[in-house]
From Swiss-Prot:
The active site is at H40, H188. InterPro entries: Cyclic-nucl_3Pdiesterase, Cyclic_Pdiesterase. This is 2',3'-cyclic-nucleotide 3'-phosphodiesterase. Involved in the metabolism of ADP-ribose 1',2'-cyclic phosphate which is produced as a consequence of tRNA splicing. Gene3D superfamilies: Cyclic phosphodiesterase. GO terms for cellular component: Golgi apparatus. Substrate binds at T42, S190, Y193. The gene is CPD1.
């Protein structure tokens, strides 16, 4: 997943408190110790971010969060709530073991499409083209992945870099993002991460009982946007930065 953008309800709100309560309760129904995590909707994963240079990482995080906040605040104010919860569902996947479906609100879909285009597809496709145009800037790591060469500390002849037009790449990215938002974007709020499968009928009865104990007539507009490094164990995930949306 790499770096993901999350949309979270604000802390100390009815939505946040209810989700935390039911997530903690449901965790006890599953074997082992399922990892704990914040309630969130994943807007997109695989955001392009330079994690090698910490000073540059901070600038990139601030830039992405600022642009994301602008994009969200520019959405049409044509209805009350951006996020509306649907049914509880389950899949075989670890990260979608138990979750609330979230309605594909047109504004939420538009926001996800914008973020996917600007911070996933465009940088990835420009990098791919740069590898073709300027292979001298890249090398292979021990796993055979193409990575940028580190600048040499030795004085050497300046490497000539070929410039190329990115307008077509950016244009194509808009179409790719639109297609992704329709076919792949699946907004949801995970409740439990687990390897357990299938969920037997007795477990489902307990799940439904615990969920029905809470008034789920909740929805939220805006909230908090967080960039999260989702690598390794869930308990090791790191929030790189956040911004409140008003």
């Amino acid at each position: 997943m790499g770096v993901a953008l999350w949309l979270c309800p604000k802390r100390n709100t009815p939505t946040y408190d209810k989700l935390i309560t039911v997530m903690s309760s449901l965790n006890t129904l599953f074997p082992g110790s399922p990892p704990k995590f914040e309630p969130h909707i994943t807007i997109t994963t695989n955001i392009s971010l330079d994690l090698a240079d910490q000073s540059k990482t901070k600038d990139d995080v601030d830039r992405i969060l600022s642009a994301s906040a602008v994009a969200m605040n520019s959405l049409p104010k044509n209805h009350e709530s951006l996020v509306k919860l649907g049914n509880v569902n389950s899949q075989r996947k670890f990260f979608k073991k138990l979750y609330f479906e979230v309605e594909k609100d047109p504004n939420l879909v538009s926001f996800a499409r914008i973020i996917r285009e600007l911070f996933v597809i465009v940088p990835q496709d420009i990098e791919k083209e740069n590898i073709k145009q300027n292979p001298q800037l890249y090398t292979k790591d021990n796993n055979g992945n193409t990575i940028r060469r580190k600048p040499s500390k030795k004085k050497s002849k300046t490497t000539e870099v070929k410039e190329f037009d990115t307008s077509f790449i950016r244009q194509a990215a808009a179409y790719k993002a639109a297609e992704w938002s329709v076919q792949e974007f699946d907004p949801h709020i995970s409740l439990v991460y687990s390897d357990l499968w299938p969920l037997h009928s007795a477990l489902w009865r307990n799940i439904n009982t615990r969920i029905s104990d809470i008034d789920w007539d909740i929805e939220w507009e805006f909230g908090v946007l967080k960039l999260v490094l989702c690598e390794g164990d869930v308990n090791d995930w790191v929030v790189l930065g956040s911004v409140d949306i008003h």
